[in-house]
């Protein structure tokens, strides 16, 4: 069964743009408004980060957003409860460290997720070899566990991950944490092009994407981008009009490969 998330991100003439927000940054009551705004801006899907006290993959902008959400006492369960009444039509993706999921309980977590528009899960601190902690619970559902692939992964590992991939492949474009970047590794284009050539699902580039030029760069070698820190910062600063224009322009970038 092809997952809804794969269908949404595949076979497009234009780059798929996935945005990231921190759930509860600005208060949980604003979450639905943020989601509807991003949907209206033309994005293909939205990642919702779950605040956590030890966010090892997060850069400074997202770390601060997580702290703001934690001060509001936002939890994974509270976010999923809120999402159960969401009117958003595009797929949502939960990005959570494994600890909050364990705390809630994996069966309860999956049960709650299925009552929401969530169609994908990203767990950055769950090693690929341990994915079976989650995947048995996802059998028969429309929810994909999204693999993250690093720049340093050898071809054999890329092929192994691609063969098992569902939803899409999250290609991490830098060695390090999230955050705005001005430059990327000179080998990134070759890496992404190879990954796309072997992947049965869309390949999206994430970590550091913050400009239309970045979107255009990655649209030449993969299926789209994930934009996080820039979105989080602009929402926090109240720059919604500027953000909406940026995302609309990003979603109009044509795929060149």
UniProtKB/Swiss-Prot annotation:
Pathway participation: Amino-acid biosynthesis; L-tryptophan biosynthesis; L-tryptophan from chorismate: step 5/5
Official protein name in the record: Tryptophan synthase alpha chain
Family: Belongs to the TrpA family.
One Gene Ontology MF term: tryptophan synthase activity
Keywords, ordered alphabetically: Amino-acid biosynthesis, Aromatic amino acid biosynthesis, Lyase, Tryptophan biosynthesis
Catalytic activity, EC: 4.2.1.20
GO cellular component, as recorded: cytosol
Top class in the EC scheme: lyase
Active site: 47 (proton acceptor), 58 (proton acceptor)
Entry coiled-coil feature ranges: none
Subunit structure: Tetramer of two alpha and two beta chains.
CDD domains xrefs: Tryptophan_synthase_alpha
Function: The alpha subunit is responsible for the aldol cleavage of indoleglycerol phosphate to indole and glyceraldehyde 3-phosphate.
Catalytic reaction annotation: (1S,2R)-1-C-(indol-3-yl)glycerol 3-phosphate + L-serine = D-glyceraldehyde 3-phosphate + L-tryptophan + H2O
Pfam families: Trp_syntA
SUPFAM superfamilies, A to Z: Ribulose-phoshate binding barrel (SSF51366)
Species, as recorded: Listeria innocua serovar 6a (strain ATCC BAA-680 / CLIP 11262)
Gene label: trpA
